[in-house]
Amino acid sequence: MSKRVFMFPGQGSQYIGMGKEFYEAFPAAKEVFELAGEAAKLDVAKLCFEEEDKIDQTEYTQIAMLTTEAAILKVLQMEGVTADAAAGLSLGEYAAILAAEVMEPSDVFSLIRKRGQYMQNAVPTGGAMAAVLGMDAAVIEKVCEETIGEVFVANYNCPGQIVITGEQSAVDRASESLKEAGAKRVVPLKVSGPFHSPLLQEAGQKLSTALEKVQISTPKIGYLSNVTADYVTDPEKIRSLLPVQVCHSVCWQQTIERLIADGCDEFVEIGPGKTLSGFLRKINREIKCSNIDKLEDLKKYVG
């Protein structure tokens, strides 16, 4: 029997106008934007559709992306499309939390707004990230360990694409060493800080405090953590892992491999862009994959 996964992208795929077609076509999607706006104390619709100067700033990107993903998810659910499991990359994990009904939507929107602010404010000056293409993970890990300064693996995206993070000078040194060691390319990323590194510990601590007040339930469908790349069912374990996720590597490739090993054979990427679909094809070309970003994608998918 077929097993479907909903997967949700993280920062980087955002664009002005994302979610607008759903907002205009479905009252339920509009309600999601309004609920997110109330929880985040922000006009999220205006942010997503008009505010080009803000959409790429972490403190705004996170609530904008999550709201768009949540609105599309809501419409899919109304169309009767269900999933056996949910996973999301970085901030996308909070959309997976919504899909698995782990927390109340208003709590999730409020949390992601805080997470964006905490991460933006915790950013040390001179942090950087870079994507390393065409190199084995073990070599990258070794170079990071041997480089002088603070540099770490941020994301295990898929075979041949790993992201490093840390102090600008250390990331630059590691990038040069990786090129010398045979990396196909090392591409600096346009981000505002060294995300998913121990340098963001302060943001993790603040998020931990914010999570203390939140009611967390047992997931209704399979829910996987970026930190462990495995299913998590215990509410208290979820509470403790989410703050860790901010300053820990995102084990995305391992998460997808875990789901495939569990018999999941259809993946639906919900939200802006096709980043995760691209990763999936590099992990396993045989797996059926769709992505729903625009209204025409939805029509094509639900027939």
What are these language model-derived features?
Residues 64-69, 245-252:
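A short, flexible low-complexity segment enriched in Lys/Arg and Gly/Pro that occurs
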